[in-house]
Curated annotation (Swiss-Prot):
IGPS catalyzes the conversion of PRFAR and glutamine to IGP, AICAR and glutamate. The HisF subunit catalyzes the cyclization activity that produces IGP and AICAR from PRFAR using the ammonia provided by the HisH subunit. It comes from the Bacteria. Its main location: cytoplasm. Heterodimer of HisH and HisF. HAMAP family: HisF. One of its GO terms (biological process) is L-histidine biosynthetic process. It is found in: Cytoplasm. CDD domains: HisF. Belongs to the HisA/HisF family. InterPro entries: Aldolase_TIM, His_biosynth, HisF, IGPS_HisA/HisF, RibuloseP-bd_barrel. Pfam families: His_biosynth (PF00977). This is Imidazole glycerol phosphate synthase subunit HisF.
Amino acid sequence: MLAKRIIPCLDVDNGRVVKGVQFVDIKDAGDPVEVAKRYNEQGADEITFLDITATSDERDTTYHTVERMAETVFVPLTVGGGVRKIADIRNLLNAGADKVAINSAAVFTPEFVGEAAQKFGNQCIVVAIDAKRVADIEVDGIIMPRWEIFTHGGRKPTGIDAVAWARKMAELGAGELLVTSMDGDGTKKGYDLALMKQITSRVNVPVIASGGVGNLQHLAEGVLEGGVDAVLAASIFHFGEYTVQEAKAYMAAQGIQMRL
């Protein structure tokens, strides 16, 4: 069995790491290169860097920051934000990213994901899905939750069902899915395990859980109950509540295979 991964996430806005609650109410958490260096030293399995306003501001992700980060950290680096065309992916990979996350552009042009996977290999294409729980639906007399995907850093609703979208992205060639519960983001109440289960049971690519971690138990629940392959967190690491080592030790103690 493959070891499960812990991935600290750096949401970056105007060159600073920030952390919000449900995609708003933003707090400063430091310089991205310094923060990434700290997680590299703590034994993070990967680091994710998301330029959270690149799409809504219609600009490119800061390549210079990615270059500096890639020189400093020696674990796989996933970069996203403002990725709209093949050249953006090439530039990010050339700047030192190991994987590139596509979010809004996948919604506008789904075939872009397939084209990117074909050109660069699906191992370096991550599709990021920002999902919000909407009105429940009835299926065969059973009330089921339904999630919809949002774009532009969680600002624009699409009407697209998140679970069906996850399947479509996996079929088109995404090597991995980064699934964020917008309802959970920054709330510290735990992942949306129902959402994670719905997606992990329907796709055959790795799924990363994101949105809502408040303690180490939440990380373990993502794997044990949500069925995910990797757990992403920000607040609990950024503000010094836990280190990555503590998180790994806790998960290993729960019987989860980790790289210690």
